[in-house]
């Protein structure tokens, strides 16, 4: 609980500001597009620091590094709340992302070292609660605070939690002996920072996060800026791999421990964690957007669609933590992905007549599958790993989840726009005067709008009678056309959501065969994990 507090706060902060962007833009005199940099700046800084955290602990120690990150996160949160202009707020969010990027991997490594292997699943259950539930709670909490108080309080909220976390960490957490030996060795031999490796890492993941966050908004490769950052990401990634392998061959300490990917368990767990982040963050954004834009739900009610699923995960995580010590991780992961696939198949029945209860049960079913994934995926990531590599494992698995979440969000935004346009284009071909059904429908709607008998739908009703010199007939025609287009757009958008969910279903189902490539862990695998 001591270290989970700060991680919950950090993951919460990655989504809590989403619903407050219009208020932030208005309060600081910025446009909506400019305000999105509040999100982008945080994500980019966070992605850069995540894999570098393990490297930094060898210089100053894990406890000290963790406390510095908590302190930086708390101070920068207060600065965000006090920011008088958007550029200052964006700068403070960069600092906040730097502080937040070191929290999750440090906590995971602390848990792996603190708890014996047979109790590690239960420890990861608490950590999983923070990581899995926070994205679902964030938008609801952010909306409530913004509506009832002020957007600045979404940042001030972090300060007391940081203070509590710092106090508890200083009293309870200690570095294990091997970390102290690493720090002593580093200080004795002198600090030799891998500056080039860190620069290439920052350019790779910073560019990737920027592209994922801004790609759809700027029309992907239709934008020279996006094309430039994609090129920079690819070139930097190739150069980073070459440089880090060169550092390994020369016996130096590279910033990324790429030798972990030689182990099938870790390589597959990295892939599975990416998909978990993709599905978790993607659907967490998908459902509220669907109910708000197409079903007319308020932000608060949209949040209540997600909340029961969060409660389900809170109940299931301790159960899965207990089972992880009794059941082979492959079986738990297989059950989780099968459950997730079936829940997405059910969710592919989205339509405009769904009730609140149906939506809630869809999410609860999905949450029950997600709960069976996080803990066992982390468990297999640590199998066969040396204790001195715990920091590297935690940094890379958290990076996989974050990049997966960003990719899922970008995928949803892109496919929603493109599939909606595709379905609209397909449907509009039949809406021509040559179609008898269309003519009859238009005639019926025009009569209803023109007659004002109360039978016409209210959509676009304000248009009727305001068509200019053409009189009421002209206005009724425009009102009828507006009503038909509104219906067409709603149906096209609904079909686009269904398409996205079907793609997600295929994506998740494709992970099940990967489990057959996992070597069966020996009976003492749990005991050897992290040692």
What do the predicted segments below correspond to?
Residues 160-179, 204-214, 232-247, 514-519:
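C-terminal membrane-cytosol helix-exit motif in multi-pass small-molecule transporters
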Residues 34, 403-510, 514-517, 529-531:
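Hydrophobic transmembrane architecture of multi-pass small-molecule transporters
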Residues 1-60, 66, 87-89, 150, ...:
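Transmembrane core module of solute transporters
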Residues 50-198, 214, 223:
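Helix-loop-helix hairpins in multi-pass membrane proteins, especially solute transporters
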Residues 72-82, 99, 161-168, 235-239, ...:
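Transmembrane-helix signature of multi-pass solute transporters
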Residues 10, 39-42, 46, 73, ...:
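Structural signature of transmembrane alpha-helices in multi-pass secondary transporters
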Residues 11, 15, 81, 97-105, ...:
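Small-residue-rich segments within alpha-helical transmembrane domains of MFS-like 12-TM solute carriers
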Residues 124, 133-139, 143, 283, ...:
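Small-residue-rich alpha-helical segments with characteristic i,i+4
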């Amino acid at each position: 609980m001591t270290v989970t507090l700060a991680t919950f706060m950090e993951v919460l902060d990655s989504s809590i500001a989403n619903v407050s962007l219009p208020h932030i833009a208005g309060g600081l005199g910025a446009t909506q597009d400019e305000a999105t940099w509040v999100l982008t700046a945080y994500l980019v800084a966070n992605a850069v620091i995540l894999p570098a955290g393990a490297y930094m602990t060898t210089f100053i120690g894990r406890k000290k590094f963790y406390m510095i990150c908590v302190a930086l996160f708390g101070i920068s949160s207060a600065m965000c709340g006090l920011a008088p202009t958007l550029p200052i707020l964006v700068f403070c969010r960069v600092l906040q992302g730097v502080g937040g990027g070191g929290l999750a991997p440090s906590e995971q490594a602390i848990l792996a070292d603190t708890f014996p292997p047979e109790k590690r699943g239960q420890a990861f259950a608490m950590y999983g609660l923070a990581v899995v539930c926070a994205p679902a709670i964030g938008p609801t909490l952010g909306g409530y605070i913004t509506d009832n108080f002020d957007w600045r309080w979404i940042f001030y909220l972090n300060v007391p939690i940081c203070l509590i976390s710092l106090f508890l960490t200083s009293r309870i957490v200690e570095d294990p002996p091997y970390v102290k030996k690493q720090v002593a060795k580093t200080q004795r031999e002198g600090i030799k920072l891998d500056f080039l490796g860190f620069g290439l890492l920052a350019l790779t993941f910073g560019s990737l996060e920027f592209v994922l966050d801004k790609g759809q908004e700027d029309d992907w490769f239709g934008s020279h800026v996006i094309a430039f950052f994609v090129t920079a990401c690819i070139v930097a990634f190739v150069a980073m791999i070459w440089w880090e392998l060169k550092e390994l061959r020369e016996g130096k300490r590279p910033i990324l421990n790429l030798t972990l990917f030689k182990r099938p368990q870790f390589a597959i767990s990295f892939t599975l964690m990416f998909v978990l982040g993709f599905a978790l963050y993607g659907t967490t954004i998908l459902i509220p957007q669907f109910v708000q834009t197409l079903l007319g739900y308020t932000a608060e009610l949209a949040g209540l669609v997600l909340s029961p699923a969060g409660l389900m995960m809170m109940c299931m995580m301790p159960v899965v933590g207990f089972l992880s010590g009794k059941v082979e991780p492959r079986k738990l992961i297989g059950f989780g992905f099968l459950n997730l696939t079936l829940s997405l198949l059910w969710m592919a029945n989205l339509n405009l007549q769904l009730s609140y209860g149906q939506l809630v049960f869809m999410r609860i079913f999905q949450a029950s599958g997600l709960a069976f994934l996080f803990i066992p995926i982390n468990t297999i990531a640590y199998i066969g790993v040396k204790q001195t590599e715990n920091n590297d494992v935690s940094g890379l698995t958290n990076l996989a989840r974050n990049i997966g979440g960003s990719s899922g969000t970008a995928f949803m935004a892109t496919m929603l726009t493109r599939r909606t346009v595709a379905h609209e284009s397909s449907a509009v071909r039949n809406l021509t005067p040559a179609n008898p059904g269309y003519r009859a429908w238009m005639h019926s709607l025009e009569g209803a709008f023109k007659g004002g008998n109360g039978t016409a739908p209210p959509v676009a009703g304000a248009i009727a009678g305001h068509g200019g010199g053409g009189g009421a007939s002209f206005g009724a025609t425009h009102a009828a056309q507006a009503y038909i287009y509104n219906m067409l757009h709603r149906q096209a958008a609904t079909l686009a959501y269904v398409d996205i969910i079907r793609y997600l279903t295929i994506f998740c189902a494709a992970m099940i065969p990967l489990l057959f490539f996992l070597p069966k862990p020996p009976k003492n695998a749990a005991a050897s994990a992290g040692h």
